[in-house]
A protein has these predicted regions:
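Bacterial N-terminal signal peptides
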Residues: 9-17
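Bacterial N-terminal signal peptides that target proteins for export
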Residues: 1-10
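Carbohydrate-interacting regions of secretory-pathway proteins
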Residues: 21-214
Length: 214
């Protein structure tokens, strides 16, 4: 009987650990309103027909950020943007998955990081990866200092940030940026979904880790 009880106890622990490790995806945007979010300028964000929309027509930008903060996670989002739009997904305070066309410098999928020496940890110059004014799928893996981005299933970069080179942020809110500037007047970025999945330290990414061109 003691052996059976021990077996059941160990099995329960293993099952519980597996369930915890395989945390389910949870929506950050509920498709109805901006509950759980706060904006620096609420006039630049709205929910319409189940979609989260960020826009500016006056040259002034704004951020919309979650009330909650996150450390180890995967984030996936479905979005489309206008051609001259400049936006991005903030995470861990000042890391950003860029959503823009700023050629010849970079395109959507760049890892914008103003606290690093080069401003970008990596860039994207492949124009075929994003569809302007159509739905696109972005995904972020942030576990410890390791960051990976995907755009429409293609991996854009996989970097373990070096504290000797980069200013490291361990956690922070998730945010949507509407970039300021007259050049971006009339811009709009639209999100159909923004989902998050908590990770344990060291959990592997759910997407393939293969760099474009390999």
């Amino acid at each position: 009987m003691a052996k059976i009880k021990l077996y059941l106890y160990v099995s329960t622990l293993i099952t519980a650990s597996f369930v915890f490790a395989e945390a389910s995806w949870e929506p950050l945007f509920n498709g109805k309103d901006l509950s759980g979010w706060r904006a620096t300028d609420p006039s630049k964000f709205k929910v319409e027909d189940g979609l989260l929309i960020g826009f500016q027509n006056d040259g002034k930008g704004a951020d919309l950020r979650t009330v909650d903060e996150f450390d180890h996670f995967e984030l996936k989002f479905r979005y489309k943007r206008t051609e001259k739009g400049n936006s991005g997904i903030w995470f861990r305070q000042f890391y950003q998955f860029d959503l823009l066309d700023m050629m010849p410098v970079t395109l959507s999928g760049a890892f914008y990081y103003p606290k690093c020496p080069t401003t970008f940890v990596w860039k994207n110059v492949d124009e075929s990866l994003e569809k302007t004014n159509e739905w696109n799928e972005g995904q972020i893996y942030a576990n410890g200092n390791r960051i990976i981005f995907w755009l429409n299933g293609q991996m854009l970069g996989d970097e373990t940030l070096d504290p000797k080179v980069h200013r490291i942020s361990k956690s922070g809110s998730i945010g949507v940026q509407v970039h300021g500037g007259d050049a971006f007047k009339g811009m709009q970025v639209t999100f159909q979904k923004i989902d998050i999945r908590s990770l344990n330290p060291g959990d592997p990414p759910s997407m393939p880790v293969v760099v474009v061109g390999e």
